[in-house]
């Protein structure tokens, strides 16, 4: 199972993550609405991950995981394919 596939299973988007990503300008209102319109958590996560296309967006995503009590997801990223350099996690290459 690749990193993106596993993240679609373990990220919890519905309790603060999406709103925080909106406030950090990672998502636009339109993108937020599109993600939220997906019927299942798996599909919401997949839609969200598809929108993370830059290193800056991925860095903010990882930071937001920590802020929304999803440290276990951040730990999974850094231990299973995420490249930890200079205190950041680079996962944009792995998500695409």
Regions of interest found by a model, annotated:
Residues 1-96:
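Death-fold homotypic interaction modules
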